[in-house]
Amino acid sequence: MMSRANSRFSCQRTWLLAVVVLAAIWSSSLHQAAARVFNDDCPNLMGNRDLYKKVEWICDDCANIFRIPGMASICRKDCFFNEDFLWCVRATERTEEMMQLKQWVRILGAGRM
């Protein structure tokens, strides 16, 4: 027969186990969500997140200037390898950086099919 103290200890242990399991699941899903923040179209993103953020800044600025719904996503399409991205570079008056930005886009899109 189980005493009241043993029963309470067993219940506490069960709750502790449940909390640990839920924390592990939450942590895992949070990590996956953070990884999805970055563009899935860019195959060479790992190790080049600093380049990605610099190139993405152009799209964010463009979206802020024109306030067109989905403009930032259109600019990021195909890992920035599109005419809309080039248009945004011109619209944000960063044409002097065009060659550098194109090089970064090629690095990010290396291996893209």
UniProtKB/Swiss-Prot annotation:
Pfam families, sorted: Crust_neurohorm
Signal peptide from the UniProt entry: 1-35
Keyword flag Disulfide bond: yes
TM region positions: none
A cellular component annotation (GO) from this entry: extracellular region
Keyword Endoplasmic reticulum: no
Superkingdom in the source lineage: Eukaryota
Key words, A-Z: Disulfide bond, Hormone, Neuropeptide, Secreted, Signal
Subcellular location: Secreted
Coiled-coil segments: none
Cysteines engaged in disulfide bonds, as pairs: 42-79, 59-75, 62-88
MF-aspect GO terms: neuropeptide hormone activity
GO biological process, alphabetically ordered: circadian rhythm; neuropeptide signaling pathway
Record family assignment: Belongs to the arthropod CHH/MIH/GIH/VIH hormone family.
Function of the molecule: Inhibits Y-organs where molting hormone (ecdysteroid) is secreted. A molting cycle is initiated when MIH secretion diminishes or stops.
Protein name: Molt-inhibiting hormone
Protein species of origin: Charybdis feriata (Crucifix crab)
Organism classification: Eukaryota, Metazoa, Ecdysozoa, Arthropoda, Crustacea
